[in-house]
Structure formats: C-alpha cells, structure tokens
C-alpha cells in the first residue's frame, strides 16, 4: 500500500480540505505535477485548473484559480487564491472567474499582458474540463 502525506487546501475564505492523501495532482504554472510521500521539497505556483487528491474516501477534486503549493516528503500545503470543490462548481461561479480574468487582461500593463492572457486561457480551459 502506498504511503500518505498530509494534504491541506486553504483559500483566504476558508479551509477546504485537510486529510491524509496517497497522491495530490497539482496544476502547476510550469506544468502539472503529482506529489506523493517522499517528494523532494518544492514550492510551486499554481495556474487555474483542477487539483485532485486521492484520500481515504476516494478522489476529491477542486477547481483553483491560482496560488502556491509547498510540498515536502510528508505534506503538501496549497494556498489557493480561490478554490471550489468540483461538485459545488457551477456555471455562474466559472463565469465570475472568467469575468475577473477578462478584466485583468483589459487593465494589464504591456509587460503583464502575456501572463494575464495565459490566465484567461487557463480559466477557459478550466470551464471546458469542468464540463460547463
């Protein structure tokens, strides 16, 4: 049986999850990654996407809009800008996320435009992967 690591997911509003997980799939800015027990210490930024954690009651999935993940051999702590359990994710919530991303594109300075457009594209991909 695979070992576990402590998984914690928090947003500024609340703690969404805290349990022992066998693996956590993270939508990293530089590419998706999977954290498991024994992982090398890493800090990564998140892009909008679906975070999945395999726990005692099966896979739990959360839509995140960005943030940070700190991973070590025994735990992963995710601080998400915004996060919603996939089963609570609605078209209205996704519309709000996309509207905020569009607003950021419209006000971005030239040097920040590429990052803002990438975030918007990730939000649109999040909508597609969530089936809304």
UniProtKB/Swiss-Prot annotation:
GO cellular component, one term: proton-transporting ATP synthase complex
Main location, first listed in the record: membrane
UniProt-annotated location(s): Cell inner membrane
CDD domains xrefs: F1-ATPase_delta
Topology in the lipid bilayer: Peripheral membrane protein
Record's keyword annotation contains Transmembrane: no
GO terms assigned for molecular function: ATP binding; proton-transporting ATP synthase activity, rotational mechanism
Pfam family, one: ATP-synt_DE_N
Keywords: ATP synthesis, Cell inner membrane, Cell membrane, CF(1), Hydrogen ion transport, Ion transport, Membrane, Transport
Top-level lineage group: Bacteria
InterPro entries in the record: ATP_synth_F1_dsu/esu (IPR001469), ATP_synth_F1_dsu/esu_N (IPR020546), ATPsynth_dsu/esu_N (IPR036771)
Assembly notes: F-type ATPases have 2 components, CF(1) - the catalytic core - and CF(0) - the membrane proton channel. CF(1) has five subunits: alpha(3), beta(3), gamma(1), delta(1), epsilon(1). CF(0) has three main subunits: a, b and c.
Record function comment: Produces ATP from ADP in the presence of a proton gradient across the membrane.
Similarity field: Belongs to the ATPase epsilon chain family.
Protein name as catalogued: ATP synthase epsilon chain
Organism the protein comes from: Cereibacter sphaeroides (strain ATCC 17025 / ATH 2.4.3)
């Amino acid at each position: 049986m695979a070992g576990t690591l402590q998984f914690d997911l928090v947003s500024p509003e609340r703690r969404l999850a805290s349990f022992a997980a066998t693996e956590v799939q993270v939508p990293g800015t530089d590419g998706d990654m999977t954290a498991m027990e024994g992982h090398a210490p890493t800090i990564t930024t998140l892009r909008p996407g679906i975070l999945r954690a395999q726990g005692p009651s099966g896979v739990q999935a959360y839509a995140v809009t960005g943030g940070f993940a700190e991973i070590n051999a025994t735990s992963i702590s995710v601080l998400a800008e915004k996060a919603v359990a996939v089963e609570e994710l609605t078209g209205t919530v996704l519309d709000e996320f996309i509207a905020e991303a569009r607003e950021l594109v419209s006000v971005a300075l030239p040097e920040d435009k590429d990052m803002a457009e990438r975030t918007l594209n990730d939000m649109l991909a999040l909508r597609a992967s969530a089936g809304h």
